[in-house]
Amino acid sequence: TSIYTCYEGVGLPVDPLQGCHYYVTSQTCGFVPLLPIEVMKDRCCRELAAISSNCRCEGLRVFIDRAFPPSQSQGGGPPQPPLAPRCPTEVKRDFARTLALPGQCNLPTIHGGPYCVFP
C-alpha cells in the first residue's frame, strides 16, 4: 500500500482519530480531563490501531491538520474546547505526532517501527 491509497474512505476512516482529540488536549493543556486519562488514551490507541500500519502516519497527519490547524494559533480554525482556550496549537500538534511512539500507543507504521516522519 502506498501513501496514495491512504486517504479518507480508502485506507483511512472518514474524519480519523476523533477519539484522540481530547486525549491530546488533556495531555498538553494542563486541565483535568472529564474521563480518566487511561480511558481516553486507550480509545485513541484503539482508533489508531484500527488503521493499517501503512496508513497510520497519514491518518495522524490528517487528524493533526484537521483537529489542530496551524492557523488556529493566529485565531483561525475550529474553536478549541472551552477548558483550554489559550493552549498553543503547536504544542498539541507536537504531542499528536508522538501517538505511534512506544510511550504512547506503540504501533508499527509504514516506516517499520512505532514512529512517523512528518515534514
UniProtKB/Swiss-Prot annotation:
Main location: secreted
Temperature profile: Optimum temperature is 25 degrees Celsius.
Superkingdom to which the source organism belongs: Eukaryota
GO cellular component terms attached to this protein's record: extracellular region
GO molecular function, one term: serine-type endopeptidase inhibitor activity
UniProt KW keywords: Disulfide bond, Protease inhibitor, Secreted, Serine protease inhibitor
Transmembrane segments: none
Entry's pH dependence statement: Optimum pH range is 7.0-9.0.
Subcellular location: Secreted
Disulfide bonds: 6-55, 20-44, 29-87, 45-105, 57-116
Residue stretches in coiled coil: none
UniProt-listed InterPro entries: Allergen/soft/tryp_amyl_inhib, Allergen/tryp_amyl_inhib_CS, Bifun_inhib/LTP/seed_sf, Bifunc_inhib/LTP/seed_store
Similarity annotation: Belongs to the protease inhibitor I6 (cereal trypsin/alpha-amylase inhibitor) family.
Function: Inhibits bovine, insect and wheat chymotrypsins. Inhibits bovine chymotrypsin with Ki of 0.6 nM. Does not inhibit human or wheat alpha-amylases, bovine pancreatic trypsin, or trypsin-like activity isolated from wheat.
Protein name: Chymotrypsin inhibitor WCI
Protein's organism: Triticum aestivum
